[in-house]
Amino acid sequence: MKIAVTGATGYIGRQLVRAAAERGHAVLALVRRPDDELARFASQHVMDGELPRHLEGADAIAHLAGLAHVRRTGRSDGAAFEDANRQFALTVADAAQRAGVARLAYVSSIGVHGNRSDAPIVESSPFAPDTPYAVSKLMGEQALTRFHAQTPSRLVIVRPPMVYGPGCPGNLPRLARLVARGLPLPFAAVTARRSFVYVGNLVDFLLRAVQPDVTGECFVVGDGSDFSLAELVTLMAGAAGVRSRMFPVPPALLRTGARAVCLRREMDSLTRPMLVDWSHARTALGWSPPFKPDEAMATTLAALWPERQRGILAKVGPE
């Protein structure tokens, strides 16, 4: 099978390109500029006005390109996110349709359902996006759904929670570096669990989602990587070889303090529950994640401190 990948130079995209090539697929990486590392695993085309021509011969496309953070350009955050996560998604879908690509997998975000939930999130859970990024991802889903309703091609929407793995960007490595300094942290009482997904498992699911037997539908994806902030800090301290020095502060008080310094959303994402129910992915596609959560997190944290690869002694998280 020939698989095209947008966002191929991003964190997930690189892993997807490599995994697809290693499984014997022909891979077309759509990039803004040529990349020497990707050249080992894929043919490359620079995205331009000839996108339909570049996609000729592809059986499926995984659309990962988008905008997660705004660099100030004088435009509103909402407009920048909409251009990247809605309008560009439609451009790719139109090019794929013109090129005869049969299947498109759109990587959205669990954030379309909000940033907290007392019940596990499923595909039919209410929409409640609360950031410009999440709003734009939902707009992308809705626009692509309308577009594909008029075409014979199939659309698969994938909603992952926060993605982690060796070398991952974002809050996880920042928190790990803070823990490694051995400073006292006020997170011992933060026991609400949130779902994550290991990048290797997400990539495995995406390769399943673009197979010919998959009908167009939506999937919440996870792998059992459910951790509280207190559990993460304990794991990180073990991986860094330092003593965990947490003390309890009520989560509500942490959120109040965060609001005072304009970090309300960040603290919400650390202290409130947000679990996903990915049973539909298991039952509909017969999919099982190849990497176990405790092993995946241990691998991720060990990569932060390669000189301390002593393993993580305590197994935290589901079986």
Predicted regions and their residues:
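Conserved Rossmann-fold NAD(P)-dependent oxidoreductase catalytic core, especially the SDR/UDP-sugar
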Residues: 90-132
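NAD(P)H-binding glycine-rich loop region in Rossmannoid oxidoreductase-like domains
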Residues: 36, 46-91, 95-98
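Mid/C-terminal beta-alpha module of Rossmann-like enzyme folds, strongest
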Residues: 208-266, 294, 298-301, 308-319
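Glycine-rich Rossmann NAD(P)(H)-binding loop
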Residues: 6, 165, 187-192, 219-227, ...
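Active-site Tyr-X1-5-Lys
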Residues: 130-156
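N-terminal Rossmann NAD(P)H-binding glycine-rich loop of SDR-like oxidoreductase domains
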Residues: 3-23
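A conserved pocket-lining segment of Rossmann-fold NAD(P)-dependent short-chain dehydrogenase/reductase
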Residues: 73, 177-197, 201, 205-209, ...
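Glycine/proline-rich active-site loop of Rossmann-fold NAD(P)-dependent oxidoreductases
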Residues: 138, 151-153, 164-174, 209-219, ...
